[in-house]
C-alpha cells in the first residue's frame, strides 16, 4: 500500500495475505475470492498479482488464474469483476498511478485496459506479434510508457499507454 507503508499484500497459490505490521504477521484475506466449498480446488486462489489503487488505499485488485477480483474495504471481502474477461488466466497487472481508475491486465490473449475501475475492458493488442503476454510494467519516469514481455516474441514497448505496441530490439548476451 503506497500510502500506508505498514500495510502489505501478497498473492500466493493459496490466495491473498495481508500484513498490517510491515510483514511481522500475515493473515489470509480470501472472503469472496471463491465459495468456501471450493476453497481447496479453486484456481481463483492462485493469485498471480496484487495491486493497491494509489488513489484509494482500501481498493485492491487481485489477478488470479480464474479472473480478476476487487475489494473496496481493505480486503475484508472480494468481488469478481470484469465478466468480459471471465475465467481468463491473468498473469500480470498494473494499476495506473497517474490515470485514476485505470487498470491493465495481461495474459494468454494479450493486454486489456479498463478506465473505470474494472467495469468495462478494451483489448489493446495492436502491434503485438503474439497475444501470450507474461509481464507488464509501467515506467517510473513516464506514465505513458509501458513494457510487455511475451512468451516467444520478445519484449514490446508502448509509448501511448498501451494503444499501440512496437517490438524492442532483441537483447543479446554481449560477453
Where are these regions (language model features)?
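Extracellular glycan-interacting surfaces
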Residues: 1-175
Amino acid at each position: 500500500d503506497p500510502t500506508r507503508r505498514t500495510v502489505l499484500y501478497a498473492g500466493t497459490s493459496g490466495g491473498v495475505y495481508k500484513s498490517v505490521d510491515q510483514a511481522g504477521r500475515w493473515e489470509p484475506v480470501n472472503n469472496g475470492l471463491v465459495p468456501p466449498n471450493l476453497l481447496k480446488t479453486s484456481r481463483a486462489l492462485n493469485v498471480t498479482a496484487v495491486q493497491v489503487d494509489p488513489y484509494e488505499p482500501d481498493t485492491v485488485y487481485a489477478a488470479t488464474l480464474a479472473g480478476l477480483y476487487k475489494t473496496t474495504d481493505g480486503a475484508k471481502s472480494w468481488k469478481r469483476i470484469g465478466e468480459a474477461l471471465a475465467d481468463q488466466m491473468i498473469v500480470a497487472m498494473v494499476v495506473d498511478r497517474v490515470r485514476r481508475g485505470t487498470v491493465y491486465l495481461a495474459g494468454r490473449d494479450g493486454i486489456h485496459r479498463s478506465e473505470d475501475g474494472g467495469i468495462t475492458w478494451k483489448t489493446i493488442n495492436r502491434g503485438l506479434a503474439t497475444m501470450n503476454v507474461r509481464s507488464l510494467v509501467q515506467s517510473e519516469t513516464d506514465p505513458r510508457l509501458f513494457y510487455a514481455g511475451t512468451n516467444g516474441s520478445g519484449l514490446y514497448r508502448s509509448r501511448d499507454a498501451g494503444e499501440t505496441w512496437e517490438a524492442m530490439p532483441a537483447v543479446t548476451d554481449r560477453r
